[in-house]
Structures are given as C-alpha cells and as structure tokens.
C-alpha cells in the first residue's frame, strides 16, 4: 500500500511538472481592471489544482478498491474541464466588459465636469442658499420621517436578502434530500433513515418559519406605512392648526410609543432571524456528519467484503493443506509398508542364499531353479527401490507445496488480522459518529423546542401587532375627530369675526353721517 501511494504521488508530481492537461488556460492574462476578479481567479485556480490532485493522486488505490470510482473518474475530470473552461471564459469576458465600462465612465465624468465648470457660480450659490433655507424650514418636520424611511429601506433590503437566502437554503435542502434518497437505495441504515426523516421535518418547519417571517414582515411594512401616513397627516395638521399643538403632543407621544413597540418587534424579528441562521448552520453540519458517516459505512462494508474474501481464501488454503496432509500420511504409510516388504524380501533372500549354499551340495539339480527365483527377487527388489525413490521425490514435492501453502496461510492470517484491526478502528469511529449524531439529535430537539418557543413568541408578536394596529386606527379616528372640532371652531370664530366686522363697519358709517350733518 505504501509503495503504491508513493508511486502515485511521484506520477502526480511528474504530471504537474509537465502540465499534461491540454485544456489548462496558460495563455490567459491576469485581469487588471478588477482586483476582486483577480483574487477569485487565483482562488479558482488553487481549488481546481487541489481537485485534480485529489482525483489523480488517489486514483490507483481507489481503482484497486472500487471499480466504480475508476469508471467515473474520467467523467469527473471532464466535468472539471468544462467547469474550468466556462469560468475562465466568463472571467475574460467580464474583464473586457469592465474595461470598456471604465473607459465609458471616465469619458462621461470628463464631459460632465466640463459642463459643470462652464456654468456660472452665482446660480450655484443662490441654489445652495435657497436649498439651505428650505432644509432648515423643513428639518423639524422631516427628520423623523427621513430617519424612519432610511431605517425601513435598510430593513427591507435586509429582509429581501434574508428571503433570498432562505430560498437558496430550501433549494439546497431539496437537492440534499434527493441525494440522500438516491444513496438510501443502495445503503440500508436505520440511523440514516432517521436523519433523513428529521431533515425532512426540519425542512417543513423551516418553510413554516419562512411563511411566518414573511407574514411578520408584511405586517411590519403595513405598520410602517401607517406610521408614515400618520406622520404626513401630522405635518398637515401642524401647518393647518397651530393652536391645537398642545393637544396633539399627547397623540405624538402615543405614536412614539407605537413606534417603540414596532422597533421592539423588529428587534424580536432580527433575533428570530439570527436563530434561524444558527438553525441553518446546524442542519448543514448535520448533513456533513451524515455524509462522513455514510462514507465510513461504505468503507467498512468494502473492508468487510475484503475480509470475507480473505477468509474464504484462507478456508480454501486450510482445506487444501488438510488434504495434502492426508495424502502425505497415506504416502508415509505406503512407504512404511514398502520398507517392511523390502525387509521381508531381504530376509527371504538371505534365507534363500543360506538355503542355496546348503542345498548346492545336497541338491545340485535344483540349483538352476533357485538361481532363477533369486534373479526374479532381485528384479522385484530393484522395482521396489525405484518405487521408493519416486515416492520420496513425490513426498519432497508435497512438502514444498505444504511450505508454500503455509506461507500463503500466514500472509492471509496477517492480512485478516490487519483487516480486523482496521474494521475495529472503523467500528470505534462509527460508534463515535453515532454518539455525535445522538448529541446532534438532542441538540436538534432543543432547537425544535426553541423553534416552538419562537413560534409562540411570533404568535404573541402578531397579537401585539394587531393590538398596535387597532390602537393606531383608534388614534387616527381621534385625530379626525379633533380636526373636525378644530374646523368647526375655526368656522365659528370666522363667523363671529365677520359679524363683529359688520357691526364695527356699521358704527363707523353712522358716525360719519352724524359728523357730516
């Protein structure tokens, strides 16, 4: 394993030094018009290099362990090539467009500056003085409105960004859900099923939270519009009736209280948004833990498969060794039988020789027959000797095969022990992962409780917003009634003033007539 990894690293270094990739964008110039684009391109190059390093460095070892990776490796490299080409072409086009825009922008600025220099300075001064007076006159009326508009614009921008982020997270959750469903078809794990079910439940809860957040944002926007209308209405009242300012200050304090309530509601909404972002981070970390656990389970399954294959090989070697041992025992028994038969033949030959030597003198005619029997026995002895040598050579071959099988068996046992150690380590790691998953599940339950509390708080906030809306409507009705009374009093005062003016005019005319007479 170490030699294979070292060879793969050497091959990767050679390939990186030679730059064997024909699709690499060597001729591309570094963009000078955008610093952000240059930094992103450098990061993209580093990431693509790292991805290719991961693909090519471990390709040999992974191909030995799994043929599927070896089949998908060229497809992955092709995808990286297409991605890299598209990104570099887009970057080049963006660089050209940004350069053209900068040139056009500088030319427009120069033309505008020339036009502004040619205009007289007196008009500028008069305009500035008039605008300054108008700003001083309207500053007391528009400070609160401008501040509220600015804060509402910032809040709306933040809410739109948050809504976009929520939509992106929903899409990511759907993609991860599809990936997990595809992986679940090939992997049977109860923990993964539970985690997938929890992720779906969290996705539904996230959708509900998004809907509630949107409802709260709509209500807050309506309240802001009502406040702006009230404030504009207050400015009209202030210009139309200065005598009732003391009575309307109380209503302004009420409006300030409503505004503070709305700000408190916005703070609660921002806290809920922060907790929602924290919840999204937790779901992302849970997905990462799930992917790591699945990779560990797949590795453990592959190791178990290799362990089973090695165990089968070891069983076959053991069976073969037992059969060879039985054959050796049979041959040894046969050799012992041959040796005993040879000893018996030798004893018979000696007995026959003694009998021949004794019978030569006594029975001369039977000498030829005895010599023939002796020659036959010698031939049989030579044949038995040849059989004995053949059996000894066969026993030597069997012993050599036995030694080879024992060495293979020792190597297989060492490999099995190593695989068992690795499987034990993986089991421990899986146990740790399961404990961590349990902790994350517990944390998810706590987050669920927190989400329930936030839902209750959101319902309370909706009720509070409804109450503020009702109070705002009541305040508007009170303002309308006050304006009606003010208009009636103004009409009454105008009628009295007209009557008084007529009486005074009549007296003046009578005095003139008397003086003339």
From Swiss-Prot:
Residue stretches making up the NAB domain: 21-101
One annotated Gene Ontology cellular component of this protein: membrane
Single GO molecular function: actin binding
Basic residues composition-biased segments: 10-21
Pfam families: KIP1 (PF07765)
Superkingdom, natural source: Eukaryota
Sorted UniProt keywords: Coiled coil
Basic and acidic residues compositional bias, start-end: 121-135
Zinc in keyword set: no
Region (Disordered): 1-29, 101-159
Biased composition regions of type Low complexity, renumbered to the chain: 107-119
Coiled coil (residue ranges): 156-486
InterPro entries recorded: NAB, NET_actin-binding_domain
Entry's family note: Belongs to the NET family.
Role summary: Plant-specific actin binding protein. May be part of a membrane-cytoskeletal adapter complex.
Name the record gives this protein: Protein NETWORKED 4B
